[in-house]
Structure formats: C-alpha cells, structure tokens
Amino acid sequence: MNRIDQEQVSGFTRVLRSVVTILCLGSVFAAAQSAGPSHTITTIASTVPGNGDINPYGIVVVPQTTGKLIQGNLLISNFNASSNFQGTGTTIVQISPSGQRTLFAHIDPDHLPVTCTGGVGLTTALVALRSGWVIVGSLPTSDGTSATAQAGCLLVLNSSGRVVESIYGTLINGPWDMTAMDRSSVNGGGSAALFVTNVLNGTVAAHGSVVHGGTVVRIDLKLSTGAAPFVQAMTVIGSGFAERTDPGALVIGPTGVGLSRDGFSLYVADSLNNRIVAIPFPLTRQSSANTGMTVTRGGALNDPLGLNVAANGVIFTVNGNDGFMVQTAPTGLQVAKDQLDSSGNPPGAGALFGLVTVGQSVYYVDDATNTLNLFQ
C-alpha cells in the first residue's frame, strides 16, 4: 500500500470535496489493511475451448439475457491459437459463475464476412451491450510476432455469436482494450459510446524503440432495433501515449480503460510509464487531451494492464510484471495490493490481463494457467 506525492494528485483534489467520499475512502483503506489474509482465490473454469485457443485476454459480464447470452455469465476472448502464436486467437467463450463453459463465438478468419485488416486475433478489447451486441477488438498477426502485426478492427457480433459488422479505418490501429458507456435498451434501441486504446501507431516500424503514438478513441454508436450499430462519429480523445513492440508481449502501450462513476473521467493504464491517467470529459470532448492527467504513478504499480472501475469508484488494475492487483482511489491513493499469481520467474510476470469487478468480488483471467478465477 503506497501513498503518492502531491504532484501526482494535482488536478484531482476536486474529486475529494465531499466528506462522505473521504470517509468511504478511509473505510476502503482500513479494510485493505485488515482483510488481506482473508481473501480467497478460486479457479472457476478453464478458458480453453475445443479448438485449443489459449491466452485469455478480454473479460466482460453479460448484462442481459438474449440469444446465446445469459445475464451474469462472463465472456472471455482468447488472443492465441493452439499454436501459441499471439494475435491468432479466434474464439470467445461464455462461462457461468458456477464454471459451465460454452463456446459463444468462433470467428473464422478464412470466411470473415466483413473487412478487418490482417484477419483475426482477439484482444482485451471486449464489451457486451444490453441490446445484445458484443464488440471485440482484433489485432492480428500471421506468425505471432510483431513484425506481422496489422491494424485489425473491431468486430461486431450479434447475440448468437455471428459477426455482422466491423468498425475499421485510420483511427482504429491495433485495438488493445475497450470499455463502453451503454445507453442501449433491451429492445435494441438507444446509443453507446466505446472507448478504445490503440497500440500500433508507428510501433512496428520502430522495431522495438518507444514511440509516442498510442491513442484513445471514442466511437459514438447509434443503435436501432433490427439493425447493426451505426457509427455516428469517431474522435481521438487521448494521444501521445508511449508504445513499443516487445518479443514477449507482442506490443506494450496504453491498455485498460474505465469510466469514473460520474462519467467525468476516463482512466487509462499507461503501461510503459507505469501510471494511471485520467482523460477529462471523455463523453463530450471533441479534441485530444493528449495523455491526460496523472492519477497515480509507481508505488505498487508494475506495468499496469487490465483496468476496471468498481461500483464504489475504486480503480482496479493488474500488473503485467509481477502478478499483483492494485486498488487505487480516485484521489490517486493506492489503497491495496494483492498477488493473484506467483508462478514463473519472475513470479507472476505475464500472467494477468483482463479483470472485472462484480460487487465485492473480482473475476480475472490468468494467462499462465488459461483459467477464469474469482478473487473475493
């Protein structure tokens, strides 16, 4: 548990104006100090489907029962095929909290009905809307190396797991993670705003050197009953994030994203700079906030990747380098850390990616064991 200095919380003191918030954060900090040993980790199920896809990345809770989707189940996207080549995974599995696994979608790159530059390699970018649409990012490779990585797209699937549309273009370049403000209804109407991190802007050409081309793009969708989502606008709201290719991780750059409870901030895991930043007014801004404002840096963070905002506003992230999960208050105070995976050398490195909070619990995927797990 670590405190950060005054510079790191600059610009965020307004979040703490209410006494209620201060008291709540104090309670969270006290609980984190006293409850650590009582936490348990339970393996729910393997994430490996029949075709052998591995390396689970994205995870999201199904918000509404429709088609093949069952409310409360978890959808998980796989980044690797059975060959263990990164950027070749083609499946999304659905797992119930009791551990029953079914195949939600197998997206055949040889028979893709839509445009997706380079093919299929499903990333952490995964959302499920109340209207039944599932949207997943693709950052494909042909041989598992960054040399063959291509721009990909966002694939839009219906509630039966069938691809009906793709979102692509110059602003979509290696979609790595994603969250959404869902204003859709169960009958299919309404709207949604997607927030996508992109990590391939100049990275492949730099051959491992750091470039500052990572972006966060807002995609405004109009949803109509009986029709595929319609893209009304795409806006770069964050830019200049550090990114580079990596022989082990394929690519490193801005990863997890999550909206604050009031929608006034979009938190971004700035992995290479080992910090969490906030982009102000993400739902309405029409220009880039560059890399936003630093919420917290260093401390227990160690290559923050997946990010999720809990109902109480606390920011949960998982580290790529040591297997720890870190909890950070909106003020920037790191209130707790827990080790979710200690396997490998160094312990926990490369094991964690996607996570989602449900009440007082956290579901997360473990790449080292190819499993869905529950922390509570």
Predicted segment positions?
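Beta-propeller blade signature
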Residues: 89-98, 149-161, 211-222
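Structural signal for beta-propeller blades
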Residues: 84, 92, 154, 203-204, ...
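Short loop/turn segments immediately following the C-termini of beta-strands
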Residues: 79-81, 138-141, 149, 183, ...
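Beta-rich, blade/repeat-based domains predominating
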Residues: 48-72, 87, 108-134, 140-141, ...
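Loop/turn-rich, solvent-exposed surfaces of beta-rich toroidal or solenoidal domains
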Residues: 271-275, 294-338
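Surface-exposed loop and turn segments in beta-propeller and other repeat-based domains
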Residues: 34-52, 97-120, 156-175, 222-225, ...
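N-terminal secretory signal peptides that target proteins for export/translocation
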Residues: 1-14
